[in-house]
């Protein structure tokens, strides 16, 4: 069992039950999945860039990502239908908690000029999105072996019914919100 998973069961569930007045522990919001998505626009002209992006995301997530392909052709972006334009990986269970632990305790403090993450990036249904500008904040990525700095989007999906519940859940996981 992951460290954060145990922390969730022992500390967060009782706190949230008390705070929001849940009658059953099954009502307490929990993390469903974490999705890491990396859009690679340079892959249109150079196929090797996609391999490097997949390798980076594999190191970060600990599992192999799936290559996302264009649904439609867009002439303005020189994209053809079915062409590889990004990669994504969905984490669930123990891997999800392990990634979240590394992200909050190791990766976020390595962000330049870090003052906390925004508390406004919730979608209204209890899910949270955060964009990372550089993949080198993760300790798995070696700075010398990076060909280009690529950003990625991290989507945290929860069972929370409101943003307030989701924020309390993520704050329980020690997310450093600035407001």
Swiss-Prot record:
InterPro entries: Ribosomal_uL5, Ribosomal_uL5_bac-type, Ribosomal_uL5_C, Ribosomal_uL5_CS, Ribosomal_uL5_dom_sf, Ribosomal_uL5_N. Keywords: Ribonucleoprotein, Ribosomal protein, RNA-binding, rRNA-binding, tRNA-binding. One of its GO terms (cellular component) is ribonucleoprotein complex. GO terms for molecular function: rRNA binding; structural constituent of ribosome; tRNA binding. GO terms for biological process: translation. It holds the Pfam family Ribosomal_L5_C. It comes from the Bacteria. Disulfide bonds: none annotated. This is one of the proteins that bind and probably mediate the attachment of the 5S RNA into the large ribosomal subunit, where it forms part of the central protuberance. In the 70S ribosome it contacts protein S13 of the 30S subunit (bridge B1b), connecting the 2 subunits; this bridge is implicated in subunit movement. Contacts the P site tRNA; the 5S rRNA and some of its associated proteins might help stabilize positioning of ribosome-bound tRNAs. Part of the 50S ribosomal subunit; part of the 5S rRNA/L5/L18/L25 subcomplex. Contacts the 5S rRNA and the P site tRNA. Forms a bridge to the 30S subunit in the 70S ribosome. Belongs to the universal ribosomal protein uL5 family. HAMAP family: Ribosomal_uL5_B (MF_01333_B). PANTHER family: 60S RIBOSOMAL PROTEIN L11-RELATED. This is Large ribosomal subunit protein uL5. The lineage of its organism: Bacteria, Pseudomonadati, Pseudomonadota, Betaproteobacteria, Burkholderiales.
């Amino acid at each position: 069992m992951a460290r954060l998973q145990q922390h969730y069961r022992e500390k967060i569930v009782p706190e949230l039950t008390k705070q929001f007045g849940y009658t059953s522990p099954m009502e307490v919001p929990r993390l469903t999945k974490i999705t890491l998505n990396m859009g690679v626009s340079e892959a249109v002209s150079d196929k090797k860039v996609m391999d490097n992006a997949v390798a980076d995301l594999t190191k970060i997530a600990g599992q192999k990502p799936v290559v996302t392909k264009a649904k439609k052709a867009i002439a303005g972006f020189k994209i053809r239908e079915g062409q590889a334009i990004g990669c994504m990986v969905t984490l669930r269970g123990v891997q999800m908690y392990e990634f979240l632990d590394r992200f909050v305790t190791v990766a976020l403090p390595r962000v330049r000029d870090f003052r906390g993450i925004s508390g406004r990036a919730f979608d209204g249904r209890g899910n949270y999105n955060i964009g990372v500008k550089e993949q080198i904040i993760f300790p798995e990525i070696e700075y010398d072996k990076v060909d280009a700095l690529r950003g990625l989007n991290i989507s945290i999906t929860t069972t929370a019914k409101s943003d307030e519940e989701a924020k309390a859940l993520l704050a329980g996981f020690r997310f450093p919100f600035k407001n």
